[in-house]
């Protein structure tokens, strides 16, 4: 009898667990170091109420006249966010790590990097949201610029 109660309690507890969700974002924005350059990319994420995990790929274009390198990043991130949108806004903070490749002319550097930042997902219609994100990347190794700031806007689909 005691085992039956324990199993029933466990089943009730598991049946009330919150649903996992996933989302995808395509974005375009600007990276600011050493000059403003276009950046674009995508994210894929999944999580529970407050904690989420996402993979992000970003590609910043090279600007030879300003000696500004291209930067490609592949980062795994953890997001801490509000469990639901508040007046249509869902703010979040994020931190992550991964690899980068910086190139300028014939020179390149591939190494490890970390990023920290935050943003907001803005409800538009149904599962479609806008996303505004700010990140600071700290690049290890010998990059031309070891700190890069990025701001983007994107279209986010929650599923």
Each PLM stretch: what is its role?
Residues 45-115, 122-126, 151-159:
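Gram-negative (and chloroplast) outer-membrane scaffold detector with strong preference
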């Amino acid at each position: 009898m005691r085992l039956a109660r324990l199993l029933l309690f466990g089943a009730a507890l598991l049946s009330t667990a919150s649903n996992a969700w996933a989302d995808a974002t395509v974005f375009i924005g600007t990276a600011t170091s050493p000059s403003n350059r276009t950046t674009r990319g995508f994210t894929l994420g999944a999580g529970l109420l407050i904690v989420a995990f996402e993979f992000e790929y970003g590609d910043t274009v090279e600007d030879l006249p300003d000696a500004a390198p291209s930067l490609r990043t592949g980062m795994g991130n953890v997001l801490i966010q509000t469990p639901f949108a508040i007046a249509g806004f869902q703010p979040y903070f994020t931190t992550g790590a991964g690899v980068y490749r910086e190139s300028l002319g014939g020179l390149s550097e591939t190494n490890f990097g970390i990023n920290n930042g935050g943003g907001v997902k803005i409800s538009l219609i149904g599962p479609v949201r806008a996303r505004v994100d700010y990140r600071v990347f700290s690049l290890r190794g010998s990059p031309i610029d070891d700190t890069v700031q990025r701001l983007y806007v994107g279209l986010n689909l929650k599923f």
